[in-house]
Amino acid sequence: MNTEATHDQNEAQSTGVRLRNAREQLGLSQQAVAERLCLKVSTVRDIEEDKAPADLASTFLRGYIRSYARLVHIPEEELLPGLEKQAPVRPSKVAPMQSFSLGKRRKKRDGWLMTFTWLVLFVVVGLTGAWWWQNHKAQQEELTTMVDQSSAELNAGGDSAQSVPLDTSEAASQDSTPAPTAPVDSTATNAVPQTPDASATTTAPAADAQQNAVVAPSQANVDTATTAPAATGDTASLPTDQAGVATSAVDQNALVMNFTADCWLEVTDATGKKLFSGMQRKDGNLNLTGQAPYKLKIGAPAAVQIQYQGKPVDLSRFIRTNQVARLTLNAEQSPAQ
């Protein structure tokens, strides 16, 4: 009778009450139970008060109750009916599996993005290459045009230059100049540099010398023939002095160029006269004189070294950009673009 009464009384008590009574009979506190079961004191208190924490899954709660029952020596079979009521098994909400189509769509989108990125890069590289090629082609065409123009001008200049020796030869055949005057002309001609202005400067004194040489014999008597060479010597010295003065004046604006490679060049002075236009070969030298300022067009700035008024001209900014150099050299040697 007592056993049945005890059994009925245990069934009437809830799971939490039975666990609390068993704990108190063993003289354990909630803190001690929590330490042995590695639980929080609040979790032990909720179990004894038959509370199911919302943040705790029913599976874990049933496991904690069974561990608590073994600790206080209560058979688990006696607690099963109460467990079904206190911690019923609740089906967990399983999120539906996402289909692989989402991953495929994302992968496809990434593929399109990469394709578009590569396409943009190819377009940028292509446009850059086309821009560079157009600039390079334009420079080559400009150089070709300059070379053609210089060749045509040189041919025209050659035709006009060939007519000069014919005129001088005819003049020499018509004039009866004495023999001593010929060395004076050749000496004056060799003393002056082969430049357009210098040649023009030297020709005028030479012509004066020829006129003086022609007049002197006509006015002199036969008895004074010995004085004619002295007069001729005086007249010959005059063009030499004039050539020296012209040379010193020209040297003030002298333009000296040394070439380390083949280079196209065009030089124009202040009057618009082209002092030179054409190709210069490697290891060539060019000395020009004219009226400053000079305007220069250089096809290959890296292939030429320029000295103006005895000072070097800086072409580094044209060499870095690898472009046709267009500059002006004024009297103060300040090259300008």
From Swiss-Prot:
It comes from the Bacteria. It comes from Citrobacter koseri (strain ATCC BAA-895 / CDC 4225-83 / SGSC4696). Residues 193-217 have a biased composition (Low complexity). Residues 133-337 are periplasmic. It is a single-pass type II membrane protein. This is Cytoskeleton protein RodZ. Gene3D superfamilies: lambda repressor-like DNA-binding domains. Residues 1-111 are cytoplasmic. SMART domains: HTH_XRE. Residues 30-49 bind DNA. The keyword DNA-binding applies. InterPro entries: Bact_Cytoskel_RodZ (IPR050400), Cro/C1-type_HTH (IPR001387), Lambda_DNA-bd_dom_sf (IPR010982), RodZ (IPR023690), RodZ-like_C (IPR025194). The helix-turn-helix (HTH) motif in the cytoplasmic domain of the N-terminus is involved in the formation of spirals to maintain the rigid rod shape. As this protein is anchored in the cytoplasmic membrane, the HTH motif may contribute to protein-protein interactions to form the RodZ helix, which is localized beneath the cytoplasmic membrane. The C-terminal domain may be critical for determination of the rod shape by probably interacting with enzymes required for synthesis of the peptidoglycan layer, including PBPs in the periplasm. GO terms for biological process: regulation of cell shape. PROSITE patterns: HTH_CROC1 (PS50943).
